[in-house]
Each structure stands twice: as C-alpha cells, then as structure tokens.
C-alpha cells in the first residue's frame, strides 16, 4: 500500500495554482455562454420593434441555451478520450453526432404541434410573432453541433495543457459576439436575426481560434 505523500506549503500552492489555471478557461466558456443572452439583449433592445424582438430573443434562448450548454460538455469527454494519433477524427464524428441528437430538442419546438403549445399557450407568445419564434428556435438546432465541436477542440487544448489557447478562444467568442452585433445593428436588421447570427458566429470564432493556435508550430505558440 502506497504511503500518502506529504506536500510542502509551496508545493500545495503551486498545485492549486496549476489546477486553477487549468480549469478557469474552461469554466469561462460556460460563463460566457450563459452571459451572452444579456450582452446581445443590449443590442436587440435598440432595434426596431424592440419589445417583440426581445420577446423572441429570450423565449427561444430559454430552450436553446441549456441544450447548447449540454453540448459544450464535450470538453471533459475530449480530455478523457483525446485523439490517439494525428488524423484521429473519431471524437470529431462523435461530437457532430452528439450535437445533432441534442439539436433535435430545439428542432422539436419548431414543429407546429409542440411549438404552438409551448410558445403560444405555455409561454403566451403573441400570435403575431409566433411563426418567427418557431423559425428562430429551428435555426438554433444547429448551435448544438457547433458547441459540441467547440467543446471537443477546447477539451483537446486543455488535455494538452494549453490554457492560454483555450483563453484565446474565449476572447475570440467575446469579440465575435460584439462585432456581429455592432455591424448588424446599424444596418437595420431585425433584432432576432442579430441575436441568432451573433450566437452562431461567436462559438464558430472560438473553434477557429483554438484550432488555429493548436496547429501553430511550438516555437511560435506559447502555452
């Protein structure tokens, strides 16, 4: 039986910092996902017909955001089952399949029977915007695949102990979110379209940023 190892105060502090440094970027991803509806609402509230646009924004994300968060849990899966060799795409295929299955949940709410009951009766959405609500939640079906793929690449970066790479992805998420809203709002685009576009663009920016940094030469990339 192995004896318990005694650590010095300095070793404990170093280990604690390493654990914090490892988990913070991953936790930040979930935090930004939860915070993004509020950030986007500041722009949607300044669009035409803002009352209706905000109603569409919040009522659809009430369904889409929890499912997207579930898809982002691909992070620990990627940490545990990271690629075993260059070109190993098994986890990528699994992430896409898992995201597609999760995407069936918001898709179901876009169907007339479920959508009319949930949004029209349960959430009391006005009839004038009911069709737009169902269209928006149908588009959000694809966000699950995007977040699952994002979670995979972030998990791989974490498994390689590249926290700065993961953090760069979170920065890309925030920049993508703000830039999309800043560009679309002055163009007079409907608020719900701004929201849907921003929520899709932001995780795509994260995925591209993390993937690009992981593929930089080690002499260029710092972890």
Model-derived regions, located:
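Residue-level recognition of transmembrane alpha-helices
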Residues: 23, 30, 58-61, 95-99, ...
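Alpha-helical transmembrane segments of multi-pass membrane proteins
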Residues: 62-67, 126-153
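Interhelical loop/hinge segments that connect adjacent transmembrane helices in multipass membrane
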Residues: 1-33, 216-223
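C-terminal transmembrane helical hairpin of 12-TM major facilitator-type secondary transporters
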Residues: 92-141
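Interfacial/gating helices of multi-pass transporter permease domains
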Residues: 17-22, 41-65, 87, 127-134, ...
């Amino acid at each position: 039986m192995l004896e318990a190892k005694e650590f010095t105060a300095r070793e404990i502090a170093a280990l604690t910092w390493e654990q914090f440094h490892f988990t913070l970027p991953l936790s930040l991803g979930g935090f930004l996902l939860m915070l993004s509806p509020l950030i986007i609402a500041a722009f949607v509230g300044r669009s035409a017909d803002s009352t209706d646009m905000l109603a569409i924004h919040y009522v659809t994300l009430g369904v889409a955001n929890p499912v997207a968060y579930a898809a982002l849990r691909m992070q620990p899966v990627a940490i545990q089952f990271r690629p075993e060799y260059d070109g190993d795409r098994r986890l990528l295929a699994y992430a896409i399949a898992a995201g597609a299955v999760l995407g069936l949940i918001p898709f179901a709410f876009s169907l007339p029977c479920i959508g009319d009951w949930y949004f029209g009766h349960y959430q009391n959405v006005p009839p004038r915007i009911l069709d737009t609500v169902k269209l928006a939640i149908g588009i959000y079906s694809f966000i699950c695949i995007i977040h699952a793929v994002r979670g995979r690449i972030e998990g791989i970066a974490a498994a390689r102990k590249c926290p700065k790479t993961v953090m760069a992805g979170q920065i890309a998420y925030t920049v993508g979110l703000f830039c999309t809203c800043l560009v679309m709002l002055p163009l007079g685009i409907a608020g719900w379209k701004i929201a849907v576009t921003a929520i899709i663009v932001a995780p795509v920016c994260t995925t591209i940023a993390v993937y690009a940094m992981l593929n930089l030469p080690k002499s260029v990339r710092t972890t």
